[in-house]
Amino acid sequence: YRYDARLDMRMNQEQELDAYQIVNTYSFEELCRILREYGEEKFTKPIARAIEKQRAIQPIETTFQLVDVIKSALPDKVLRQKGHPAKQTFQALRIEVNDELGALQKGLEEALSLLKPNGRCAIITFHSLEDRMVKNVFKEYSSAPYIDPRIPIKASDIKQADYNLITKKPITATDEELKENHRSHSAKLRVI
């Protein structure tokens, strides 16, 4: 949304699905789903409606055209707030185009399967969707299975968790780091 270019967003230029296809072919419901799930967008329905309305007139081909459509769907109060009004929509499109959460899930599982005993896996995330996924996967892998206390079983028969959670809460940038690197404000580090 910073530069006017064709709607693409593919990390792999050989794959078929791009942002242009999503914006111009996804149904209202599909647009709402990705905006809600991947963009955590509050104005999901107005944005999806505005996209549908515009593409009925002519296809939305460029980033600036899409930004204008998004802005037309948002209240003035939101447009005056800090931050770009299209940020969450573009994030949602990028995640959908590249299946970023699927790739993260697969990468986490593969990384954990490769860990040697007492090995560590450290992951830095940059937005809440990624962080929530890492937190949940780490929690799943570091938790012992639930056993009903009424079941007569010896403590030695209970399978322990395969991994130990090193950071219960994420490590975030210090004030000093933030001064040196302003982009680190959203970074969170988790270690298992």
Regions found by a protein language model. Give the residues of each.
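S-adenosyl-L-methionine-dependent methyltransferase catalytic core, i.e., the SAM/SAH-binding region
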Residues: 1-192
